[in-house]
């Protein structure tokens, strides 16, 4: 994934990615570079434009990402409900704290 991300950074900078540029990005990020992986990346991406790769990736994300928003929505709803319960409990505890003794008035 790091190698593909480095490739994407070079492409987004406006340059046509080459092995040396991808290696430079990886080196700047502190990644231990394996030349065989760089070679494999360029073999896999040979003949494909960056725009084509992005379009292909988006179509894959759309197909598999439909369940994620529902899970996030239910988590957000649970967090709101938990916060409301905590607030209610806190106000009940505060009401119990003042029993009318007036010791510190």
Swiss-Prot record:
Changes after translation: Phosphorylated.
Organism, as annotated: Leishmania braziliensis
Biological processes, Gene Ontology terms: cytoplasmic translational elongation
Gene3D superfamilies: 1.10.10.1410
Name listed for the protein in its UniProt record: Large ribosomal subunit protein P2
Signal peptide segment: none
Family, as annotated: Belongs to the eukaryotic ribosomal protein P1/P2 family.
Assembly, per entry: P1 and P2 exist as dimers at the large ribosomal subunit.
Gene that this polypeptide is encoded by: LIP2
Any one Gene Ontology molecular-function term assigned to this protein's record: structural constituent of ribosome
Function: Plays an important role in the elongation step of protein synthesis.
InterPro entries membership: P1/P2_N_sf, Ribosomal_P1/P2, Ribosomal_P1/P2_euk, Ribosomal_P2
Keywords: Phosphoprotein, Ribonucleoprotein, Ribosomal protein
